[in-house]
Amino acid sequence: LSINLNKVLTFERSGGKTIFKQLHFLLGGKVMSGNKEFFYRRLHSLLGVIPVGLFLIQHLVVNHFATNGPEAFNKAAHFMEQLPFRYALELFVIFLPLIYHAVYGVYIAFTAQNNTSRFSYLRNWLFRLQRISGIITLIFVSWHVWETRIQAQLGAEVNYDMMANILSSPFMLGFYIVGVLSTIFHFANGLWSFAVSWGITVSPRSQRISTYVTLGIFIALSYVGLRAIFAFV
């Protein structure tokens, strides 16, 4: 930016001091707005891993108990229901972080720019898939909460039979397969972005290694998730 000091001084002496201050305020406001945007994105990234991502892993592990039969799953589900301060944990550790991550994620999905037309490498396509999987995950999680947590508040019992009844429909079985895989992909691919944005993987080599690690996480969790789904069928 090139500034002519004589013109600035002339501008201020000629009565432009107030306007100059207003311009400075607006520029400062823009910087502050940028700082807020940076903070919101960092918070979105952090909450996607801690606690939302950790809850996803825990939820998949609990569901995987269904592979050992109805009794094993019901026992694991009952254990989770008996946790101390359960409702406070659900509100502050799960639902509020999840709502923020989802709402701000939708904002990012509809405002971020695609680079796939200019750059054809894998990472840009994964960036696009991250946004698509986020929307699918939001739809799936919202429906899953309605079918389980909301129904539980209305008097239904969350147990093996509930999930078996839901997944007895071929449509719902397909919906859950797509939803679970989208959710796991969104988490695993999000880990890659998290590591980059938080300065954990800076070099190209570390980012390549991170790609393989997150791919392994996606495969491992997908195996757990799909086994759990078919255990109810």
Predicted regions and their residues:
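Membrane-embedded alpha-helical bundles that constitute the cytochrome b-like, heme-associated redox core
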Residues: 3-5, 20-233
